[in-house]
Amino acid sequence: MFARVFKAMPARAPAFTSVNASIQSRFMATVRQGRPATERATFTIRDGPIFHGKSFGARSNISGEAVFTTSLVGYPESLTDPSYRGQILVFTQPLIGNYGVPSAERDQHGLLKYFESPNLQAAGVVVADVAEQYSHWTAVESLGEWCAREGVPAISGVDTRAIVTYLREQGSSLARITVGEEYDADQDEAFVDPEQIHLVRQVSTKAPFHVSAADPQCHVAVIDCGVKENILRSLVSRGASITVFPFDYPIHKVAHHFDGVFISNGPGDPTHCQDTVYHLRRLMETSQVPIFGICLGHQLLALANGARTIKLKYGNRAHNIPALDTTTGRCHITSQNHGYAVDASTLPSDWKPYFVNLNDSSNEGMIHKTRPIFSTQFHPEAKGGPLDSSYLFDIYLDSVVKYKNHQLAFHPNRNTVPSPLLVDLLAKERVGVQPTIGMQNVAAAAAAAVAAA
């Protein structure tokens, strides 16, 4: 059999020549873009080691919080996840970029098929080795070309094992990527802490938008703290039309027009979102509407109920983290991306832990004892990652439809009450969200935040 296969193979010389021509063409395109393929770059951890490598992204400098992910695949989804806003993402997988970067194609709902937001969200990218040549039927450009086009610096050729070991032992640290210049150890002001910036304000839609289901069974209000596209898809594909609101929208004032409320993921310190916490508290005081929160949404829901959140030493960022369902005893492999967690010991008496992380015993979810309200720290929509817990969307939407039917039974004219939101006139995608910003703009944003305080 193998003899027949090898005999049928074409001569290699023309193919090799074609590959060489392709490589040369890409190299020349890179040079024409003004991004030298082997320009020196430096990754510096504040009060820590310095690593020298090569730039393969934008020719700019950036600072942020250095965090790491152990995910093997899904780098386009990770890098466009708004939860990574302001962070320099270190990949433990040795080779990144071998299947390229897909297009910004949208599905039948108008949602991005391959990205979690329209722009690259991470402040910087750190890899051991980057694939200059890619191969995948959805790919339209290389990882380096994408980073350069999005204005995000990236560095390869560094010892990511040593970086991750340092971050694991010392905790997530401020770091800096510089391209084409030496780092001055005295420039302490070059390190900007994104945790001091209200990052949710940067990634949340600036005005409501609406996405209709093909066969709508209910209408859900989504609080956008940096929502991932696949979360929206997970709701819409199950028959929920959604109206997405800015993070600080007074949702309790319009909740009676909806069958459920969902609180999304997002970046940064949850205590920055005091407006959201207040509106959620008022929502639970004035409405019995079902509520589901994911990631940052889980933390905000906990804060609204009087619990506290804590910052983890280095966070949980991977696609293979085990979480125990305390109600069934079943273990799920989950996708996670968070640097904060809910302190389960501070949950009020009418709440109980729903999921527990089997690696570090941190809280991964909570559920109300008598009301249809629950939340998870992990991402049941995955993308990338396993779909073990995607059934949670079904549980949530079952409670939403049940609530809707109950409301109609007692208020048969509920659907004819005029709504202040004319959904047909709303935008169909997030409004006014800006691409990730460079180090200088981050510093300016931090200074503005301090001045405003």
From Swiss-Prot:
What SUPFAM superfamilies does the record point to? Carbamoyl phosphate synthetase, small subunit N-terminal domain, Class I glutamine amidotransferase-like
Note the Gene3D superfamilies from the entry. 3.40.50.880, Carbamoyl-phosphate synthase small subunit, N-terminal domain
| Keywords from the UniProt entry | Amino-acid biosynthesis, Arginine biosynthesis, ATP-binding, Glutamine amidotransferase, Ligase, Mitochondrion, Nucleotide-binding, Transit peptide
Family matches, as Pfam families: CPSase_sm_chain, GATase
Q: EC number(s)?
A: 6.3.5.5
Q: Which GO terms describe its cellular component?
A: carbamoyl-phosphate synthase complex; mitochondrial matrix
Hey, which pathway is this one from?
Amino-acid biosynthesis; L-arginine biosynthesis; carbamoyl phosphate from bicarbonate: step 1/1
- Record field: catalytic activity: hydrogencarbonate + L-glutamine + 2 ATP + H2O = carbamoyl phosphate + L-glutamate + 2 ADP + phosphate + 2 H(+)
CDD domains reported in the protein's UniProt record: GATase1_CPSase
**Keyword Transport, does the record have it?**
no
Q: Can you say where in the cell this protein is located? A: Mitochondrion matrix
Q: Which domain of life is it from?
A: Eukaryota
Where does the Glutamine amidotransferase type-1 domain start and stop, copy by copy?
A: 219-406
Q: Which GO terms describe its biological process?
A: 'de novo' pyrimidine nucleobase biosynthetic process; glutamine metabolic process; L-arginine biosynthetic process; pyrimidine nucleotide biosynthetic process
Per the Swiss-Prot or TrEMBL record, the active site comprises 295, 379, 381
Where would one find the signal peptide in this protein? none
Tell me which SMART domains the record gives. CPSase_sm_chain
Describe its partners and assembly state: Heterodimer composed of 2 chains; the small (or glutamine) chain promotes the hydrolysis of glutamine to ammonia, which is used by the large (or ammonia) chain to synthesize carbamoyl phosphate.
Q: Which family does it belong to?
A: Belongs to the CarA family.
Please report the name of this protein according to its UniProt entry. Answer: Carbamoyl phosphate synthase arginine-specific small chain
- Which species is listed as the source? Aspergillus niger (strain ATCC MYA-4892 / CBS 513.88 / FGSC A1513)
